[in-house]
Structure formats: structure tokens, C-alpha cells
Amino acid sequence: MTDTYNSISNFIENELTALLSSDDYLMDDLAGELPNEVCRLLKAQVIEKRKDAMSRGKQDLLSKEIYDNESELRASQSQQIMELVGDIPKYSLGSELRNRVEGEPQSTSIERLIEDVLKLPQMEVADEEEVEVENDLKVLSEYSNLRKDLILKCQALQIGESKLSDILSQTNSINSLTTSIKEASEDDDISEYFATYNGKLVVALEEMKLLLEEAVKTFGNSPEKREKIKKILSELKK
């Protein structure tokens, strides 16, 4: 931060030099009312007093006070960023989010995280003529890119979360079907069931068709029942 302090000190010194070199306004109100020699002596004393009030030591104190205030402001802004982001270490953020998906206790809210990221302050370089402006612009660029990247990733997590309930529902249906098949076949290996499923289904439908054809002959005296059975048969043949 030496460059920042030197910039402040040089600015104060230049401003004071310009002020002291422009003394035309001194004693203007008394011009013509006092002898010229008296005005000259008074002007010299005023300049001397002003120089003493703005001595190098006092300039240094003023520069240090301004520098400390700026450092305090930067520290305050950094603290604000830390408070808004939260106290989650960056290396554990992924674990926190995974725990939430897996149903474990979690302390991270995606919505809260996005809200905090959006609250990160917009920061700008106060004086583009400072010596450190190039480095400051680089830091601000990295900060802005990080903020944008965080927002995009959080939004991607939101989209994924919205699809999670559908995926879990489908998974539960598959698990329920698998359990039912295992109970019916009394075999933990269900690959055989799926391999022979189509063949067994065709056989079952053929048997049903034969039974229905027999039923048509049985209900010969009931045109209404016979028509219903024929309709079922026509559907099976499609």
C-alpha cells in the first residue's frame, strides 16, 4: 500500500503548494486603508502562520489519517462481503449442497446463497489517475467474474433441484416395481424375469383369446354378451 500513501501525500503537498503560491487574496480587504509596508508585514506573517499550520509534520499526519480512513473503508467492504457470503469455507460448499440432496442435515440454502451473492456490493475505482489503478482494475475484474460465476452456478443448481423431485418419483416407482417382481418370483435376480417377460405375455394373451372364443360359443343365447366378448377379441388381435 506504499503507492497509495505516496499518492495521498503528493496530492496534499501539491494542493498546499498551489494554495500558498496564490496569495493575491491576502489582505485584499485592507488594501488602501493601511500603509503598504504594514500590509506587506501582515501578509508575510499570515503566510508564515499558514506555512506553520501546514508543515511537513502536519502534512504527514493528515496523509496518515486519510490513508487509515481509506484502509478502514476497504476493510469494512471486505468484511461486508464476508458477512454476505457467509461463513461456509469454499472447500466445504460442495459437501453442504450434496448433503442437502442426500437428505442429511444441511445449513446451506441455495436460495439464501443466491440472495447473498446478489447483495455483494458493486465496487469501483475512486480515482483512475492513481498509481495502483491498474492493479485495482484487475482485482475488480476478478471480483466481478467470480460474482457472475457464482450466480450462474447457483442458478444451475436451482434448475437441477426443480427436476430432482421428478427423478426421485421415477426412482421410487422403479424400486417399487422391482420389489414386487422379486416377491412374486422369489428370486433376487430379476434379469430372467425381464428376459422372458414378452414371451410369457404373448402366451398369456393367446390363452385368454382361446378362453374368450370358447365363451362366445357358451353364451350363444345372449347376443349382448357375445358382442362384448367379440369386441375384446378384436382388441387382442390388434
From Swiss-Prot:
Keywords: Cell cycle, Cell division, Centromere, Chromosome, Kinetochore, Meiosis, Mitosis, Nucleus, Phosphoprotein. It is found in: Nucleus; Chromosome, Centromere, Kinetochore. One of its GO terms (biological process) is meiotic cell cycle. The modification Phosphoserine is found at residue 222. Component of the inner kinetochore constitutive centromere-associated network (CCAN) (also known as central kinetochore CTF19 complex in yeast), which is composed of at least AME1, CHL4, CNN1, CTF3, CTF19, IML3, MCM16, MCM21, MCM22, MHF1, MHF2, MIF2, NKP1, NKP2, OKP1 and WIP1. NKP1 interacts directly with OKP1 and AME1. It comes from Saccharomyces cerevisiae (strain ATCC 204508 / S288c) (Baker's yeast). One of its GO terms (cellular component) is nucleus. This is Inner kinetochore subunit NKP1. Component of the kinetochore, a multiprotein complex that assembles on centromeric DNA and attaches chromosomes to spindle microtubules, mediating chromosome segregation and sister chromatid segregation during meiosis and mitosis. Component of the inner kinetochore constitutive centromere-associated network (CCAN), which serves as a structural platform for outer kinetochore assembly. Belongs to the NKP1 family.
